[in-house]
A protein has these predicted regions:
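Ribokinase/PfkB-type carbohydrate-kinase core domain
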Residues: 1-144, 150-151, 203-209, 218-220
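Conserved post-catalytic alpha-helical subdomain immediately downstream of the catalytic base
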Residues: 144-213, 218
Length: 220
């Protein structure tokens, strides 16, 4: 394990990974133990997938793995499905309106898992399958940071969560301050909504253009 991880700055995994099989779960746990022993920052996207395992199975595994996590990404049903923490009532048309419940859920993660130093989430008000408002929120060092709200007409609603996570990690490893990190992450996420297929084929400059634009109504 060491030969694969010893030169890494961060280790990123999602809830999809240990759900694949018991062997993969054990491999992830082994990697996380190595990271903890060698001061490698661990970032976890809870990313619950009900077709892969039940909430009960997810909670047993993910609550155990959380002892190794430094930074947590939790969206929508992830809080309750993987950790048993209530933060979202299941209505995607009012996600942003539930921001106080999200904040409390994020705080509860840090209370139950004190090794987790920061938590971030994507909040959405979805009005139709294609039309919605999107924003990011980031809790770190005892303070919440919120991105602007972006109104988006989606071309394809696939991969936006992964785009958010990737851009969030990009911000962390490149030393962005917390506000810039969450603004960059949500900008990458909404940009992905205007691109077909899974891969967010954009540059940092593309994301900055969205991030620095005063126009928060996006469509392509």
């Amino acid at each position: 394990m060491g030969k694969y991880l010893r030169v890494r700055d961060v280790f990123y995994f999602s809830g999809v990974t240990p759900a694949v099989s018991k062997y993969v779960e054990d491999t992830v746990r082994c990697a996380l133990k190595y990271c903890k022993e060698n001061d490698i920052q661990v970032i976890c996207d809870l990313n619950y997938r009900g077709k892969m395992w039940s909430k009960e199975q997810a909670q047993v595994v993910m609550r155990d793995l959380m002892q190794y996590v430094d930074v947590c990404i939790a969206n929508d049903e992830d809080f309750e499905a993987t950790l048993g923490i209530h933060a979202f009532d299941g209505d995607l048309s009012t996600g942003i309106d539930q921001i106080d419940a999200y904040k409390e859920g994020m705080l509860e993660i840090t209370r139950q898992f004190p090794n987790v130093k920061s938590v971030t989430s994507v909040l959405r008000n979805m009005y139709t399958v294609e039309e919605g408002d999107w924003m990011g929120i980031y809790y770190v060092d005892g303070k919440f940071y919120q991105s602007p709200i972006h109104r988006v007409h989606s071309l394809e609603a696939v991969g936006a969560g992964d785009a958010y996570g990737a851009a969030f990690v990009h911000g962390l490893i490149n030393g962005f301050d917390p506000q810039k990190t969450v603004d960059f992450a949500i900008s990458a996420s909404v940009l992905k909504l205007m691109i077909q297929h899974d891969f967010n084929a954009v540059t940092q400059e593309d994301v900055f253009k969205i991030m620095n634009s005063k126009n928060t109504n996006l469509s392509r």
